[in-house]
Amino acid sequence: MTIHTLKNGIRLLHIQENLPVAYCGFAVNAGTRDELENEDGLAHFLEHLLFKGTKKRKSLQIINRLEEIGGELDAYTTKEETFIYAVTPEKYVERAVELLADVMFNSTFPADEIAKERSVVEDEIQSYKDSPSELIFDDFEELVFENSALGHNILGKKKTLRKFNAKSLQNFIKRCYTTDNLLFFIQGNIDFEKVLKFAEKYFDVEKTERNFTRTAPQNYVPQSVEKSKKTFQIHCLIGNTAFSFGHKNRLAQALLNNIIGGSMLSSRLNIAVRERNGLVYSIDSSLNPYTDTGVWNIYFGCDKANFNKCNKLIYNELHKMREKPLTSAQLEKAKRQFAGQLLISAQNRENRLLAAAKSALHRNYCNTEEQTIEKLKAVSIENLYEISQEMFDIERLTVLKYI
């Protein structure tokens, strides 16, 4: 694994692996939280428009450039990053690199394409509103990160979307898509010298630097909010702020989250609420770290008649985590489970590469699964007990209910 910085500030992440396909793309240190007032949804809208025309290609030419050889082009936007990437048979990797560079550096944002894509995103917003189990996560972060751009919905609002034009998109690129904010990642049977030649050929752009800094959310105040929704179930999120992406205790907190409500059926919440009492179809907790803060929450949906029972069982499990430290045997079991999950998830090469690119983008390094597992060994009973005191503190929990 190699991380290298070009003269113009663009960084390269190279992972050589003997594969019949190649993965490559750009990670941009720009997302929803970098939008200014009245720019809600602009980062996501830009991601859509990057594929709608360049100085030498129309939209359909961009689509067909990789699909005609069986390749795929994809993208997504988060609160802090935008990813634009491709997978292609290894012998066509240069085709993918050239296309990605064209999209990144030469997009033109035709007015007719902006109008069409605005309609597409408006439909996406409406579809999202029809899915309470997804929408509630955005509404929850809006409460936790109140008065911060980090609380903004990624898709934005229809009223701001209708104001966006080519100038809006170009201004966002100029402000946020600076070369020091770009990382190009590539994985496959390609040596590093070849990657450098690709970069020299296709990434020959002027060096630019971001001239603003992000402001961390301040003064978290727990809230309890009910929203009226026409649903058969109550949907509920209970949660708290969490450690940032680079915090020394983030791995320990991730282990603690896995114990209380991770993806395994043996999590404490799943055992207590579903397996023993049959009150929900699913219940889980998730941890979402950002560069300067984070958010942790528990999600469940249940019949309205069962809500109080579910709530009592959940708070009981949180109380037990704060009152009684894990035993040595419980800790070793939790570490063994977590390590196994890491190794299995790493078999999804695309997700693994995207995670490595995110780490390299923000911290300029990325751990292997083996390195993470080695760090996991240092997590102690005392670490977890100390973290649980604040993480599961009832007085610090924000609660959002759709009823």
Give residue spans per PLM region.
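Short pre-active-site segment immediately N-terminal to the catalytic Zn-binding motif
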Residues: 28-39
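Glycine/small-residue-rich interface belts in oligomeric ring/scaffold proteins
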Residues: 54-61
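Active-site SXXK
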Residues: 41-54
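N- or domain-start disorder-to-order transition segments that initiate the globular core
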Residues: 1-21
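A glycine- and charged-residue-rich anion-binding loop/surface
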Residues: 10, 14, 32, 154, ...
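His/Glu-based metal-binding/catalytic segments typifying zinc-dependent metallopeptidases
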Residues: 16-20, 25-27, 209-267
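Charge-rich, well-structured scaffold segments of protease-associated domains
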Residues: 5, 61-210, 243-244, 261-263, ...
